[in-house]
Structures are given as C-alpha cells and as structure tokens.
Amino acid sequence: MNKLQNIRGVAFDLDGTLVDSAPGLAAAVDMALYALELPVAGEERVITWIGNGADVLMERALTWASQERATLRKTMGKPPVDEDIPAEEQVRILRKLFDKYYGEVAEEGTFLFPHVADTLGALHASGLSLGLVTNKPTPFVAPLLESLDIAKYFSVVIGGDDVQNKKPHPEPLLLVASRLGMTPEQMLFVGDSRNDIQAAKAAGCPSVGLTYGYNYGEVIALSEPDVIYDSFNDLLPALGLPHSDNQEIKND
C-alpha cells in the first residue's frame, strides 16, 4: 500500500475495468462470423477473447469458428471446407465486418460497472490527473466515453491505434504518464487483466487489479498486482478520499 502514497495521477483500462463491453463486442463478433457463414460464438466465449485488441480478437474468433465448423461438418459426414483465402486475409475481412457492426452496437452494448461514474468524479474533483489506456481501436473510444458521460474526467486518452505496441507492452502507459507530466512511479494504473498488470510492471507503475473484469478465466491475483480490489470505489479510501457507497445502475 506504500506505493499509493505519492500518487499524482491514475490511469485506467477500459473494457472490464470501467465498462462491461462484452454484450456489444460479442454481438459484433457474432454478426461478423454469421456474415461469413461461420458458427457464432456467444457472449460467454467472446469474453475469454477480449483484452488484446481487435485484430487478436478476430484471430481468436476465426480460429474457433473454423475449428467449430470443421467439427460440425465431420459430425454430419460432410467433407472439410477448402480455404482458398489465406488466413491473414480472412482476419482482415472479419475485422472489416466487425468494425462495421461494432460501430452500430457499441453504445447500446456497453455499460458502466457499478460506482465508476461517481468514483471517477471524486478522483477528478480531488485534483488527481486521470488518463485512459485501452487496446480498443481508437475510433471507437471517444464516442463511447461521451455516450457514457465520462469523457470529461480524462486529460489523456490512448487507444489501441495511438501506439505501435499495445499492452502488455509498457509503451502506452509510459506515453500517458509523459502526457500527464509525471513519472511512471507517480501514476497508478488500474486494470482487470494480466495484460494490464504486466504493462504496469514493465512501465514501473504501481498497479491495482480488479477482480470483476475479463481476465481469460484467471484470477487477477495470479498476476500479482500491488493491490487487489473487488469494487471500483475501493480506490477512494486507498487514495485518501471518502468511500462512496452510491450504487449505480447500468445506463440505458
């Protein structure tokens, strides 16, 4: 807990930390797969693919769907499908479809987790500088933050297209710290996944791991963050601010 004593700013992951984006992501993935006449995956499975950016999400979806189709065809006594299109091109096509569909469903399929809005407001009001670091494609980030009414809290926002190396590489965290005008040691990073904690460690930032997000089926403790919290508003007393017990509901 000593690492939180000299904090001047806080940066956050987005998906699985501030927002439950799985409904929108899963819907877009399934619509893209369906458009290519591939099996659809469903939200429970898509959740396990979230966290490394859209291209990796497409690779995971395509790998699963291709294997699932092969299994189904074998069960029905049908021959396997000959793929004339290289795997890289299939991923590109799937990504293009995903971007189209996600643009249509992102806002209605993304919800703030409990206590996020009031906690961000309290942190911002306290004078702490706030940043956002996400592997989500950059064009989707700003509209989503605006629709959820939390864009006003962030001085710096880094999306997946704004850096050459996404998390778990330290580059995006180092960039946020630099733009916030502080050292990595002065910036707390809050996330829900192995990638988040690895990025924080590599950048030299103290880290908070949240237990409720998307972490590939792993408990966040295995990544050894400096602090682990079950609720987002536990950040407030840790940073010397009054604890908020206001319960929020998902946005409509």
UniProtKB/Swiss-Prot annotation:
It catalyses: 2-phosphoglycolate + H2O = glycolate + phosphate. SUPFAM superfamilies: HAD-like. The active site is at D13 (nucleophile). This is Phosphoglycolate phosphatase. Mg(2+) binds at D13, D15, D192. Pathway: Organic acid metabolism; glycolate biosynthesis; glycolate from 2-phosphoglycolate: step 1/1. Its cofactor is Mg(2+); chloride. GO terms for biological process: carbohydrate metabolic process; DNA repair; glycolate biosynthetic process. Pfam families: HAD_2 (PF13419). Belongs to the HAD-like hydrolase superfamily. CbbY/CbbZ/Gph/YieH family. It is an enzyme of class 3 (hydrolase). The gene is gph. One of its GO terms (cellular component) is cytosol. One of its GO terms (molecular function) is phosphoglycolate phosphatase activity. Monomer. Keywords: Carbohydrate metabolism, Chloride, Hydrolase, Magnesium, Metal-binding. Specifically catalyzes the dephosphorylation of 2-phosphoglycolate. Is involved in the dissimilation of the intracellular 2-phosphoglycolate formed during the DNA repair of 3'-phosphoglycolate ends, a major class of DNA lesions induced by oxidative stress. Its EC number is 3.1.3.18. InterPro entries: HAD-like_hydrolase_sf, HAD-like_sf, HAD-SF_hydro_IA, HAD_2, HAD_sf, PGP-like_dom2, PGPase_prok.
